[in-house]
UniProtKB/Swiss-Prot annotation:
Protein name: Adenylate kinase isoenzyme 6
Superkingdom of origin: Eukaryota
Location in the cell: Cytoplasm; Nucleus, Nucleoplasm; Nucleus, Cajal body
Swiss-Prot/TrEMBL GO biological process terms: ribosomal small subunit biogenesis; rRNA processing
Keywords: ATP-binding, Cytoplasm, Kinase, Nucleotide-binding, Nucleus, Ribosome biogenesis, rRNA processing, Transferase
E.C. number: 2.7.4.3
Principal subcellular localization: cytoplasm
Organism: Rattus norvegicus
InterPro entries linked to this entry: Adenyl_kinase_AK6, P-loop_NTPase
GO molecular-function terms, A-Z: adenylate kinase activity; ATP binding; ATP hydrolysis activity
Family affiliation: Belongs to the adenylate kinase family. AK6 subfamily.
Catalytic activity: AMP + ATP = 2 ADP; ATP + H2O = ADP + phosphate + H(+)
Gene: Ak6
Record's keyword annotation contains Nucleotidyltransferase: no
Length: 172
């Protein structure tokens, strides 16, 4: 049976991981957090002193994910999307969170001031939405609000319905 590949993207703190794990649990699709994949496989290309974090080796991440993506049925969670091959995804969801809520979430994570401000600016200027629109066909890119717990359930239901329809349409 053919299964779709889904990308969940958005600024850190918008709820990609929470949504992705719950969606995978309910749908039976496989969940992949690119940050965890990189950490476990040491898929890095240096260290960013300014932000205090490793630099992702995008080519190695793509090589690592390629077999799973070809097979299908994968939910990918990452805050960037411009290095993934366009052919991988059947739909892309960009999660969006109001700035005040996002600020509190990132502050709770212990983000230092520059990292906090840069991520809030990223959300204000819709950087990741624009990146998704530039990287994929417009008709497969969708924005979802991610401010309150009720919206999480709404998003899961909406994506689950999309998955069901996709499976029906692609498995005669």
């Amino acid at each position: 049976m053919k299964l779709p590949n889904i990308l969940l993207t958005g600024t850190p703190g918008v709820g990609k991981t929470t949504l992705g794990k719950e969606l995978a649990s309910r749908s039976g699709l496989k969940y992949v957090n690119v940050g965890d994949l990189a950490r476990e496989g040491h898929l890095y290309d240096g260290y960013d002193e300014e932000y205090g974090c490793p630099i992702l080796d995008e080519d190695r991440v793509v090589d690592e994910l390629e077999p799973q993506m070809t097979e299908g049925g994968v939910i990918v969670d990452y805050h960037g999307c411009d290095f993934f091959p366009e052919r991988w995804f059947h739909i892309v969801f960009v999660l969006r969170t109001d700035n005040g809520i996002l600020y509190k979430r990132l502050e709770t994570r212990g983000y230092h001031e520059k990292k906090l401000q840069d991520n809030i600016q990223c959300e204000i200027f819709q950087v990741l939405y624009e990146e998704a629109m530039a990287s994929y066909k417009e008709e497969i890119v969708h924005q979802l609000p991610s401010n309150e717990p009720e919206q999480l359930e709404d998003n899961i239901n909406q994506i689950s319905k999309w998955i069901e329809q996709w499976v029906k349409d692609h498995n005669p």
